Curated annotation (Swiss-Prot):
Residues 1-92 are annotated as: N-terminal domain. Belongs to the NIP7 family. It comes from Tetraodon nigroviridis. Keywords: Nucleus, Ribosome biogenesis, RNA-binding. GO terms for cellular component: nucleolus. Residues 94-170 form the PUA domain. GO terms for biological process: ribosome assembly. It comes from the Eukaryota. This is 60S ribosome subunit biogenesis protein NIP7 homolog. Residues 93-180 are annotated as: C-terminal domain.
Length: 180
């Protein structure tokens, strides 16, 4: 387990800023202590410094996971967010999409959000902006990328994709072996 390099930090923060903007600083400097990001086996973990100090007593080969996995770096050095980061991203999300109850199950099975399943969308959402997807009861379901801007969503046909799926809470069941 090691700190992220300058390039890795830049790549990860660029990805996070698509979803939570400048609220990234609220993840690190929290009122309940200082938190940090650490890299272990190409995965980025988010943990308090107290847990980090305790984890240094464990050998690197024996350490499976520590803290919350925020995502992983691919072989091409791109950062991919994991669904385990949803609980930390949802409160700070700048742009949100609410899906109708009928479209929730489709999204949780890994499908994109169609215009017919769109309940609400945050004003001034740009095209290809990172969004957090909520149910109509304000329960975070996952995150994705807006396929259309807010203005385009108003006049598009009902079968058009408005949010590209990236991750959802259904992945806990579908990919339980690979989520650590």
């Amino acid at each position: 387990m090691r700190p992220l390099t300058e390039e890795e930090t830049k790549t990860m923060f660029e990805k996070l800023s698509k979803y939570i903007g400048e609220n990234i600083k609220l993840l690190v400097d929290r009122p309940d202590g200082t938190y940090c990001f650490r890299l272990h086996n190409d995965r980025v973990y988010y943990m308090s410094e107290r847990i980090l100090k305790l984890a240094t007593n464990i050998a690197r080969q024996k350490l499976v996971s520590v803290g919350t996995c925020f995502g992983k770096f691919t072989k091409t050095s791109k950062f991919r967010l994991h669904i385990t980061a949803l609980d930390f991203l949802a409160p700070y999300a700048k742009f949100k999409v609410w899906v109708k109850p009928g479209a929730e199950q489709s999204f949780l099975y890994g499908n994109h959000v169609l215009k017919s399943g769109l309940g609400r969308i945050t004003e001034n959402t740009a095209q290809y902006q990172g969004v957090v997807v909520y149910s109509m009861a304000d329960v975070p379901l996952g995150f994705g990328v807006a396929a259309k801007s807010t203005q385009e969503c108003r006049r598009v046909d009902p079968m058009s994709i408005v949010v590209f799926h990236q991750a959802d809470v259904g992945e806990f069941i579908r990919n339980e072996d690979s989520l650590t």
